[in-house]
Amino acid sequence: LLPLRTDGVALEVDVQLPDQLTYPIFDLNVLLGNLLDNAIEATALVTPKENQKITLKMKERFGALQLQVGNRFNSNIVPKNGTHKSDKINHGLGLKSVQEIVRRHHGKMWIVPEKDWFEINIILYDSNPEKLQGSGKSI
């Protein structure tokens, strides 16, 4: 994420995780990698450059992992093939991977698109029901 800061993108990060995570690190890497890659791609097209912004919020509460990635986007630009990426063949595989991880962890995913802001929210649930009491509060 450091290159984003040096490139002038406003970056807000709020990550509050325990030392011992109850979720596989591989799954977290896939989630963050794909969601941030999509946010970076969309934000790069925003003009003027001063309006470029990405947010990342992540915390674990009562055994549920809450993740939110938001970014500004240019709502006027809709690419012909649904992507600006050069690898159009593999386009969409990242989001499918994210959806599979959400399904595997009995989670929920919802997207909030607004005029110039896009936000994706994910909650993954731990299999330990005792930890889930009181969950459901948003980030």
Regions picked out by a protein language model, each given a short descriptive name:
Residues 106-116:
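Glycine-rich ATP-binding loops of the HATPase_c
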Residues 64, 75, 114-121:
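Glycine-rich nucleotide-binding loop
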Residues 50-63:
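Short beta-strand/loop element within the Bergerat-fold HATPase_c
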Residues 40-48:
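A short, flexible helix-to-loop-to-beta junction within the catalytic ATP-binding CA
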Residues 12-31:
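Conserved short strand/loop->alpha-helix "switch" segment adjacent to the catalytic nucleotide/phosphoryl-transfer site
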Residues 35, 39:
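Hydrophobic residues in the alpha-helical elements that line and stabilize the ATP-binding pocket
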Residues 63-92, 131-138:
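Glycine-rich/acidic phosphate-handling loop/turn and adjacent ATP-lid/helix
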